[in-house]
Amino acid sequence: MADNMTTTQIEVGPGGTNATINFEAGILECYERLSWQRALDYPGQDRLNRLKRKLESRIKTHNKSEPESKRMSLEERKAIGVKMMKVLLFMNPSAGIEGFEPYSIKNSSTSNCPNCNWTDYPPTPGKCLDDIEEEPENVDDPTEIVLRDMNNKDARQKIKEEVNTQKEGKFRLTIKRDIRNVLSLRVLVNGTFLKHPNGYKSLSTLHRLNAYDQSGRLVAKLVATDDLTVEDEEDGHRILNSLFERFDEGHSKPIRAAETAVGVLSQFGQEHRLSPEEGDN
């Protein structure tokens, strides 16, 4: 592992999930209006259909984690999303909506908006990454899988058995893997699993992922201060499988932490949270 490897830190701020879903619902509304005007080509119509299916699935999953009073339909979210667009496009805080207020600071020199200087969202107060403990939270009966002196086939089978017997709810999973006498990346995962009547188990939420190099130094950290919610059941297994595959490839060199972080984030469409430098390490 390169000595200049820096810790990859990713934070998802509170309210981000709702804001993203609502905004995408507003985009869907725009697509549908274009379709009504027969202004969409075939690729555009395909994107409309895929976005609608994705949003319907994501809203259904997200509503399960919300109190009944806060659950919203796709149509309700479309209306909020359109208002959000007005706020963003016209920089008008008076058009703001509850739960979505653009951050601004006084700056009389700004020509387009004499009272505001529009900036990126600041870090969530009290939730800076440096203030968050490094280790994932404690959970009852944590699962640790040690894969030493095992071939890839046996390692995969052991992981599958351990995960499939894990009870539903929050859990902590530690995976250690020795490959050709080199201790590979150590990954700690906090997540919430749902167990279905047919015995199928799916990852519904990923709360935290820490990755450490062979010296025990933290090199990648995914912190979900607002949970990253998996959009459909199949995603849960794909996310974990993408992790496990990195331990089962049998590389002689230690697995790269940044690559693992990219692999996990890509399942949520969050690759942009890694800088190019971090992604290349």
UniProtKB/Swiss-Prot annotation:
Domain of life: Viruses
Matches recorded under Gene3D superfamilies: S15/NS1, RNA-binding
Region (G1P2-binding): 1-103
Compartments where found: Host cytoplasm; Host nucleus
Function: Binds and inhibits the conjugation of the ubiquitin-like G1P2/ISG15 protein to its target proteins. Since G1P2/ISG15 is an early antiviral protein, NS1 may inhibit the host antiviral response. Prevents EIF2AK2/PKR activation, either by binding double strand RNA or by interacting directly with EIF2AK2/PKR. Also binds poly(A) and U6 snRNA.
Family stated for the protein in its record: Belongs to the influenza B viruses NS1 family.
This protein's name: Non-structural protein 1
The encoding gene: NS
